[in-house]
């Protein structure tokens, strides 16, 4: 039984009173109560089970650790103190009322550790014995899967509950103890986490590699040749005088170019080989997230939200509410025998016998995989993406299509390629020409045509040993070695998975958290650490190297797996972790304060209020200068003063007439008066005359949330405003000004600014939906 102390409290004026524990009084003549997590899932399952069942939603967790206290009794075996979630009070009340009206209860929360824990909490709230057969699990919301689960309930898996509880308590201990320590070192509001801090560290260390990287120059040579039949092909220089061609500068390259240019070369060898390119396995959570980032430009958070929608089901005319994919939190590539029996005939009938392998493709599992669920796949082959156009939203359909294509391809025959390689000799220079021709497309029939075209490499005409070919062109090209790339969402998720940090279900919230905390920002889809991110990582590496590192975090994940498997106990894992953590925390409390005083960075800027030399501090938006005599003197200044004189603008303050200076805030640069402190936004004039008043200009502004928009310079006299950038063109249909929207991919879309114009994007979308 999980170690817990359950404290159920409610606020009544200023007093806290203990609630009376709920005692269930089942109604033998009532319905069967099934509790799931979401209303959408409840609706689908109730339709499947029929009138004898009442299906209700818990809306996620109903109990958790308290928000205002740590909620973990360290001295009592790390027992968590659970409280009812105040925003779920009505849900709890409705569930308890239904529990008394029904004859029995089945807990059908998600089939993972989190779902197991929710079921355990529900058993406590609804007076159900967790050791009775009350837990049902299914990996797809289809009639066969639901009915099979109903017939085979099990007791709640208390080992899995302990594993989830251990993760929750570990995260609470680290966050509750480490975050206040960071507040003292940097500024209030920061947070540290067992996994998020390691993810931030990876990003910071990659940035350090990039900054330290020294590019090295090298050159390559590519030559064009023509056969006797006037067929052209290209070849690359590979060797000079029998040694690898290493060209370090332009002089060496020019010499090689002169030795090849205009001269004939002899074909000394031609080799041909066939190879099979095997298909990839169906999606796991992490591979789905990676492909959604790379191919659909979705964030991992958005991907999981859309996948949840597809799993819980959508309303399909003639079929009711249908769950379209299997459970989306999985690390398994396994496919059920039942689905294999469906997909093989589908492939042979739809694409032909040649596309069906002799036996089903089976994929090996990674050593970290728990393999508790199937891979992510469609629940039925009756709903191809083409049948769901107009039913699913655009983004839902794009993700569903990605999952569908990957699954079908995973059970198709391999692609067959023929590779041809020809070696050319021109004096001391050896060149190589290669060509790849696809003989059979196999599983790549499921890929977009652009990608398939790219797999056919350079054309290579028929060549044989002894042929003489003539050079028609030769080029030397300069290159520089490149630093390692910054992490994207996709590459960071891949790295976290490879290193065993976190679990598939945690990746999206981790990436979301480190951005919200401003430890990292995104530039061109790549993660870039902020000054705050660097500072926090530096402190954690220095004082908490024992726990905030890749190996320790990965090992801890393995111990959580062992708890779930019954091979380790909650208490032992927590005790071993806390022993290391408490020692590092105690040491850090002493050493960090000592180092802070000794290594305080002092600037050359003098505080005009008390005469002290101002010190450098770190704030939410980066470095700033503060008076060391705080709290007696609370003077602060921008850090830019420490780097030189302030940049003065040519804009005068409206209040006092002083020339304003440039400052940087959370939404970028702005103007500030050094005399009276008045602020003013930096106005960027588009040069476009306001289409409403025809007097002012359209200028770039920011909303109170920081979003850029374009408004008339005569505001408030003229309230003309547009979200997209206006351009000096007018709509041919209605005469309104045109606007330009630039997407993250760099794509620009020009459209009419008038929402009532037939050509406006939203108007066209509404018209299409109406037609359907």
Placement of each model-derived feature along the sequence:
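Conserved short loop/turn motifs at secondary-structure junctions
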Residues: 30, 110-112, 187-191, 272-281, ...
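Basic, low-complexity terminal or inter-domain segments flanking catalytic cores
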Residues: 2-33, 43-44, 51-53, 125, ...
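A short, conserved structural fragment
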Residues: 311-326, 517-526
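Short, hydrophobic-biased segments on the C-terminal half of alpha helices
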Residues: 304-308, 511-512
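Phosphate-backbone binding and catalysis cores of DNA-processing enzymes
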Residues: 26, 47, 94-268, 272, ...
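Short acidic, hydrophobic short linear motifs in intrinsically disordered regions
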Residues: 267-270, 278-292, 319-328, 483-495
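C-terminal accessory/connector segments of nucleic-acid motor ATPases
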Residues: 213-235, 265-306, 625, 629, ...
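Intrinsically disordered, low-complexity regulatory segments
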Residues: 1-168, 247-248, 254, 363, ...
């Amino acid at each position: 039984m999980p170690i817990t102390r359950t404290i159920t409290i409610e606020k009544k004026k200023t007093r806290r009173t203990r609630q009376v524990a709920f005692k269930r009084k089942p109604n033998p003549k009532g319905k069967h109560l099934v509790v799931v997590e979401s209303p959408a899932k409840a609706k689908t399952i109730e339709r499947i089970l029929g009138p004898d069942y009442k299906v209700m939603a818990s809306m996620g967790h109903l109990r958790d650790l308290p928000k205002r206290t740590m909620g973990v009794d360290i001295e009592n075996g790390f027992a968590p103190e659970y409280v009812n979630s105040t925003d779920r009070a009505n849900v709890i009340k409705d569930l308890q009322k239904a529990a008394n009206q029904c004859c029995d209860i089945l807990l059908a929360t998600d089939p993972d550790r989190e779902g197991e824990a929710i079921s355990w909490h529900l058993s406590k709230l609804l007076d159900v014995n967790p050791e009775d057969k009350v837990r049902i699990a299914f990996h797809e919301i289809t009639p066969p899967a639901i009915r099979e689960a109903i017939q085979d309930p099990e007791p709640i898996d208390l080992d899995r509950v302990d594993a989830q509880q251990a993760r929750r308590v570990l995260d609470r201990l680290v966050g509750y103890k480490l975050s206040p320590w960071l507040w003292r070192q940097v500024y209030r509001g920061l947070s540290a986490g067992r996994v998020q801090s390691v993810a931030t560290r990876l990003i910071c260390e990659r940035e350090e590699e990039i900054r330290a990287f020294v590019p090295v120059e090298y050159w390559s040579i590519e030559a064009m040749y023509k056969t006797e039949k006037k067929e052209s092909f290209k070849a690359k220089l590979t060797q000079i005088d029998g040694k690898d061609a290493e060209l370090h500068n332009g002089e060496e390259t020019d010499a090689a170019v002169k030795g090849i240019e205009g001269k004939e070369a002899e074909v000394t060898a031609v080799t041909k080989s066939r190879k099979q390119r095997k298909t990839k396995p169906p999606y796991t959570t992490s591979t789905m997230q990676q492909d959604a980032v790379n191919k659909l430009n979705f964030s991992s958070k958005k991907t999981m939200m859309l996948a949840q929608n597809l799993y819980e089901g959508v309303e399909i005319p003639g079929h009711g509410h249908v769950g379209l994919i299997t459970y989306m939190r999985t690390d398994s590539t396994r496919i059920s025998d039942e689905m294999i029996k469906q997909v093989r005939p589908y492939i042979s009938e739809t694409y032909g016998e040649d596309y069906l392998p002799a036996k089903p493709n089976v994929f090996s599992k990674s050593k970290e995989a728990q393999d508790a669920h199937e891979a992510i796949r469609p629940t039925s082959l009756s709903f191809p993406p083409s049948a769901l156009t107009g039913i699913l939203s655009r983004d839902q359909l794009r993700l569903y299509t990605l999952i569908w294509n990957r699954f079908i391809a995973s059970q198709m025959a391999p692609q067959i390629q023929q590779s041809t390689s020809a070696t050319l000799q021109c004096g001391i220079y050896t060149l190589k020409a290669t060509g790849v021709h696809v003989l059979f497309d196999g599983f790549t029939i499921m890929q977009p045509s652009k990608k398939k075209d790219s797999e056919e490499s350079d054309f290579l005409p028929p060549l044989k040993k002894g042929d003489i070919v003539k050079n028609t062109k030769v080029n030397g090209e300069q290159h520089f070695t490149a630093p390692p790339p910054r992490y994207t969402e996709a590459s960071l998720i891949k790295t976290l998975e490879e290193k065993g940090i976190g679990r598939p279900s945690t990746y999206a919230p981790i990436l979301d958290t480190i951005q919200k905390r401003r430890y990292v920002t995104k530039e061109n889809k790549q993660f870039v650490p902020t000054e705050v991110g660097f500072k926090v990582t530096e402190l954690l590496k220095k004082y908490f190297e024992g726990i905030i590192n890749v190996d320790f975090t990965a090992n801890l994940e393995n111990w959580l797996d062992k708890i779930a498997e019954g091979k380790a106990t909650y208490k032992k894992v927590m005790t071993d972790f806390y022993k290391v953590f408490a020692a590092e925390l105690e040491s850090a409390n002493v050493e960090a304060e000592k180092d802070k005083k000794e290594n305080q960075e002092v600037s050359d800027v003098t505080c005009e209020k008390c005469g002290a030399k101002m010190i450098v501090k770190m704030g939410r938006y980066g470095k700033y200068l503060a008076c060391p005599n705080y709290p007696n003197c609370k003077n602060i200044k921008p850090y830019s003063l420490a780097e030189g004189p302030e940049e003065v603008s040519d804009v005068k303050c409206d209040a006092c007439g002083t020339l304003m200076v440039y400052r940087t805030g959370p939404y970028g640069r702005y103007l500030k008066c050094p005399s009276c402190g008045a602020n003013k936004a930096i106005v960027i004039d588009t040069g476009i005359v306001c289409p409403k008043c025809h007097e002012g200009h359209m200028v770039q502004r920011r909303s109170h949330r920081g979003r850029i928009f374009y408004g008339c310079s005569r505001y408030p006299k003229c309230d003309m405003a547009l979200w997209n950038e206006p351009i000096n063109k007018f709509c041919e249909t209605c005469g309104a000004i045109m606007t330009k929207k630039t997407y993250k991919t760099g794509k620009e879309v020009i459209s009419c600014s008038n929402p009532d114009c037939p050509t406006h994007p939203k108007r066209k979308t509404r018209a299409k939906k109406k037609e359907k």
